[in-house]
């Protein structure tokens, strides 16, 4: 009853499911999970390939993250889930709480590494948005461009989507440095990351056309008008350096560069 009351008063589903899992662990351990139809949940070796990284804006999700295994990545926080079942209709999952991690006897670092590997095994896709729209109208499958080296002068509308094959909870692929490096090599330039939803992010090459304030305004408008609250990822546009694959808040980066430029001018005058 108390969990139901918390849910109807705004507590997110992931937190409620995590609370149930914790109560099962504390109550009777494995026997309870047998009754739930997940007998192997306490066997980490059997669960590690089912792990998935979930990503969210850490400022927006303090309640969701409270009892979870969490790693921080700039503006984002990653938490982790065990996907008990994945099919065309959706995902049945249990969030990885601190209690569950302790039962497994593994570290946060181990969970993160195994979850990232499991995410790669689900397939990483970088797709031209124009091809996505065309496939929705005319059918067909958009080409995965991740391992390509594009001639950006021939790309009419340079906007790309990073997600996984199932297009569910694919935005977290953004956290993997080698994937960011592949994207930079594909585009041949630095790039912006638009946090469109928890399922995917949009990639825009830094070709001088896009301005950070305009991109931030676009994200905020799309969040308010087109994305369900529980599927919103963030309103903070990111910038990624092609050479280093380092990702940072685009607005803060511009402020930092302006400050450095002003300091250099002052030094020259001095």
For each of these PLM feature ranges, what is it?
Residues 1-161:
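Charged, alpha-helical interface segments at or near domain boundaries
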Residues 164-270:
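C-terminal structured domains
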